[in-house]
Amino acid sequence: MAMSNGNNDFVVLSNSSIATSAANPSPLTPCDGDHAAQQLTPKEATRTKVSPNGCLQLNGTVKSSFLPLDNQRMPQMLPQCCHPCPYHHPLTSHSSHQECHPEAGPAAPSALASCCMQPHSEYSASLCPNHSPVYQTTCCLQPSPSFCLHHPWPDHFQHQPVQQHIANIRPSRPFKLPKSYAALIADWPVVVLGMCTMFIVVCALVGVLVPELPDFSDPLLGFEPRGTAIGQRLVTWNNMVKNTGYKATLANYPFKYADEQAKSHRDDRWSDDHYEREKREVDWNFHKDSFFCDVPSDRYSRVVFTSSGGETLWNLPAIKSMCNVDNSRIRSHPQFGDLCQRTTAASCCPSWTLGNYIAILNNRSSCQKIVERDVSHTLKLLRTCAKHYQNGTLGPDCWDMAARRKDQLKCTNVPRKCTKYNAVYQILHYLVDKDFMTPKTADYATPALKYSMLFSPTEKGESMMNIYLDNFENWNSSDGVTTITGIEFGIKHSLFQDYLLMDTVYPAIAIVIVLLVMCVYTKSMFITLMTMFAIISSLIVSYFLYRVVFHFEFFPFMNLTALIILVGIGADDAFVLCDVWNYTKFDKPHAETSETVSITLQHAALSMFVTSFTTAAAFYANYVSNITAIRCFGVYAGTAILVNYVLMVTWLPAVVVLHERYLLNIFTCFKKPQQQIYDNKSCWTVACQKCHKVLFAISEASRIFFEKVLPCIVIKFRYLWLFWFLALTVGGAYIVCINPKMKLPSLELSEFQVFRSSHPFERYDAEYKKLFMFERVHHGEELHMPITVIWGVSPEDNGNPLNPKSKGKLTLDSSFNIASPASQAWILHFCQKLRNQTFFYQTDEQDFTSCFIETFKQWMENQDCDEPALYPCCSHWSFPYKQEIFELCIKRAIMELERSTGYHLDSKTPGPRFDINDTIRAVVLEFQSTYLFTLAYEKMHQFYKEVDSWISSELSSAPEGLSNGWFVSNLEFYDLQDSLSDGTLIAMGLSVAVAFSVMLLTTWNIIISLYAIISIAGTIFVTVGSLVLLGWELNVLESVTISVAVGLSVDFAVHYGVAYRLAPDPDREGKVIFSLSRVGSAMAMAALTTFVAGAMMMPSTVLAYTQLGTFMMLIMCISWAFATFFFQCMCRCLGPQGTCGQIPLPKKLQCSAFSHALSTSPSDKGQSKTHTINAYHLDPRGPKSELEHEFYELEPLASHSCTAPEKTTYEETHICSEFFNSQAKNLGMPVHAAYNSELSKSTESDAGSALLQPPLEQHTVCHFFSLNQRCSCPDAYKHLNYGPHSCQQMGDCLCHQCSPTTSSFVQIQNGVAPLKATHQAVEGFVHPITHIHHCPCLQGRVKPAGMQNSLPRNFFLHPVQHIQAQEKIGKTNVHSLQRSIEEHLPKMAEPSSFVCRSTGSLLKTCCDPENKQRELCKNRDVSNLESSGGTENKAGGKVELSLSQTDASVNSEHFNQNEPKVLFNHLMGEAGCRSCPNNSQSCGRIVRVKCNSVDCQMPNMEANVPAVLTHSELSGESLLIKTL
């Protein structure tokens, strides 16, 4: 090791790092390797290891960089490294302090032990007592008086036997409580994981064992509004119906009569039970001579046929095909004989099919016997009779089946042939679609029969399940002639529960794919599996909270879809946390684990909380809905997301710490390639290497895309993006709000869609019910809407609105009184006024029950008072009657009504309701309205508003006993539609408000929050507009997904907004580039995983899965595009700068993540040292002037007008100015002048002051490459005192023998270097440098803000006094620096000054493999460089270095002693390999590096950061660093 001991000197460590004394001006006292090692405490010493190539890892792990493979390393085996190096003289300082490394003597031990396994500290161990802590990479076991530079750095360790894994042995220490939560995670990760696991297991057991398991047998349960005005009335009315009967709360009859008639009259004649019993006990009208057993009806199973080729079904092959399908698919099933209706024990009834009707009309024995003539004859018959059917004269009972002739009393105007067997009516009514014989098509030669129905003589219901599963589920539904497109077996909801569980395989597939993506991204199967376990556990714990803690008894099937959403969100959080962990590890590699955890959680916990809270809030916002299932789903999903967040800040950090400490590189394939070099070339090894190569190539391409290409695309075309996305937003708003609009559901609740639209069950309900006349009539489309007015019962829903089975109890109105004369007169007048309204429908039939007071008054007037038995209920009394007369006579009138008319009163019959004391407690009036029942929302809305407003106005004048009346009708579906439309808008608005609030609280910036909300609004409009175009209707599932859109779309905008605020750059463009490069890849991965999770849902049969999958794919693509292009472009054009839009807050209230950014103004940002403290950003770029705003790293790619000189001069201006201003003083080089670029010719004087204000305390330094060449000159090593004339000393320290030979080339010692995709060259001359090393431990993505890119701080300055050259590696080309670069140097006007100058090109050394003739290739023209006198910006000062020579040229063959020998290679990016102009010679590459921090902040371990590969096979032998 070489160490300086001056205040303004630097220390060159064996890991290539430089520890300047700028941060700590205390002098550096001499120390050798042993001394440094002795300073390590036992705790520090036991927790570290050294890797095979000299990089130490923390926490007991070995991490090494990728080295060349066997065929790429140097062919000759190098001698043992650790021996005394007699030529190595340590550097000295201009001060008189003792040297750190005395000159080696004969008895001195080896410079570096071959198996240097001395552990180094995880903490910042000071090498010398009076020097600031540095990152000590290697410490030999023996004293190291000198450092041997005879051997290239990688091979120095490469050939040494190294123990691959060293267990982490912690010394025993007394127990002490952790000081913080981060310390708890870092020191006790197993305890944290154990506690979390125990809690999860307990929750799982209690959640499963205590409450009943959910029942999904009725998928429609909970799909009803609760708490709305209509909903409360409907619930009350249903409760009233259920509580009306014998010994119930209410009764239609007085109690003394009810007891006698209870057994025969207590059943509801219209109840489902009655209907089912009637259905079971039906007497089949079997006649010996009849062909069919019965009339087809709704209770039979049926299927719908259509032609496979699109032709008409009215042809002989199609008709026979339908018969064959019936026989082969239904009647041949083993269970059919047990299910079918029979005329005799021997055979089942025939099916009602078109072929059988044609057979009976033409006296054929069966469908198979009919011929073409029969088909034509039947068609002619239908043409003749269709008009009679259409005008209503041909009815269902025109044929007398008993007499086998036409009924003489009916259908007198219908020809006999049209009534035969009622066949024509049944064909037109049941078997063919309604468009078959319309007047328009009656004249066609062959009317088009598109659809035909087939009725099977089996009742629909559960009994048909096996027939469907065996013969229909997996059949393609076609025999080549006809196709079954619709099925109605009555098993849709029963089958749904089975499919709901079966289709969970698709979320499982999605989880597996997301696992693979996460594994590739995190490079850790352990972290991936633990993350997925946390996601599953979130659902388990959420179920426990939902059922046990929150006491939710109802668990709708929609809750299962939360798994899909959580998989995407959980993966997002894992990506964010792992990303921030890696940044933190790189930012502060020498930090303790607890500090790393603390910094990671400081940002990641905040970022994850914002996204989790906004998404959870969007789910919780659904609680404002009135629909039970939506409310329950919102609570469950929101709770699951919050539980997932808690696990992500407890479980996942502990998992990462555990992985870092014990599990890193535990599997062979996950080791780095250099660890496998000496293994046998097994198939497993080769496969792993290939896998690494592929992953590396992909990740490198993605890194370049997100850090360079994407910012370039976003910024350069920002106005185009703004215009395009604004146009999309306007178009989406037009589609959603104006035309075609989001339609409300068009299917009744009983037909609610649960399978995908192409399923035959759904097609029957959605399409074919409307096409057959019997369904249209049965469906109730011709039924008039009733107007039911109720008094005496309060319209209150006092049940549990979160449990659809809890409807509460009936609440009677204590103020109700109808017996008073005033009430009698008012209610009679009310009935009379209602009959005069336009919405009242007058029927021809006599109405006894609509308005009971009218019937009662008439009955009283007809009673003769001469009969004593009738008194007092007779005509003697005039209306209104006395209260006691009314109460007595109303009971008698009701009993007389049934006795005289036989009219039975049921629970739904209008009239008075009595309690057990025969007191009238309620009254029901019912009238028919002119409005017909429809599913159209507008018509039902008009009906409800008109009737309700009229009744409310009338009730305002009612007497006190009748003032609390209310009206109800068949409004269940209308209420559902109304609740969906209103609730969805309210939930979305609430979600947007919460998102805005959270954004505001997170960023404290109104402008960014506003931009985020605008981006979210655009996302919502485009997404919902797309769903409208896909044919979505706003049903229950759709309402949930759309309201959740806000929560899912806010994530990306939040992440970008937070990153924008955290950006250290003062200008908009820098902030945008920072946010894109810092979180862009994580956001894309998050979108990808959620998109994949949604895509995997698409094959599902259950509609809930497919719709959620469609929605998730749309929302991910659209929200990512809006956040990346629209939101970022808004920030680039009108984004806040400095404190613009910032809410002023006391420092104590500011989030720690923003405290430094808020407190640092653009003017002092460069001086602030707090930027490196925060884990989210590294070195700030320093203040920039406006001229820089349009320049960034891919300028040539973004604009053809941007020339190479402009770009390179811009970059060198910034780089060199930052280097010299911030580091020259530290290195003993006074800053006499500032470097000025050619760019200043066009931009003139703006640049100087701004460009030359680098952050002095950021310790940024330009890192260099040098020519590594063997030096055999004993006098090559001299002590240099760095001062104003350090370059003069350098002239004396180099010999001719150290000059480049034909085999010399620019080499990076461990073969790893970061590359960038652009060609930028910055060269300068400073003090002597030679032995440049890249830290082999570099793992992780690094994105210093300095130049809007991600270069690791891993190239370090080594002022060693010889230039080494390494022999060619393997069969790679020989590189040499051949041509003089004299032309690229400024002609100095005075000997003591020179400036940084850019060649404007990337130099490539080429070598002819045959004659070793060396040439120099150039990528760009270098003619743009001029002398320093005429091209420099007058506004800035010059950066000068004192030289003692006037000759500033470099000889092409030798480095003369009178010449400056430092090549400032400040190269940024990857140089592509090109051939030399005149011969086919391979070109080497000079690798570009950047200015960066001097404190050698290298990662001390690999924190599941993707690995670094350097193989010549990759990217044309490119040297790249993996940062994705």
From Swiss-Prot:
The keyword Transmembrane helix applies. InterPro entries: Dispatched_Hh_regulator, HMGCR/SNAP/NPC1-like_SSD, MMPL_dom, SSD. GO terms for molecular function: molecular carrier activity. Keywords: Developmental protein, Glycoprotein, Membrane, Transmembrane, Transmembrane helix. One of its GO terms (biological process) is regulation of protein secretion. The chain crosses the membrane at residues 190-210, 500-520, 525-545, 549-569, 604-624, 638-658, 719-739, 988-1008, 1010-1030, 1040-1060, 1079-1099, 1107-1127. Glycans are attached at N59, N582. GO terms for cellular component: basolateral plasma membrane; membrane. The keyword Metal-binding does not apply. It is found in: Membrane. It is a multi-pass membrane protein. Residues 486-658 form the SSD domain. Interacts with SHH via the cholesterol anchor of the dually lipid-modified SHH (ShhNp). Functions in hedgehog (Hh) signaling. Regulates the release and extracellular accumulation of cholesterol-modified hedgehog proteins and is hence required for effective production of the Hh signal. Synergizes with SCUBE2 to cause an increase in SHH secretion. Belongs to the dispatched family. This is Protein dispatched homolog 1.
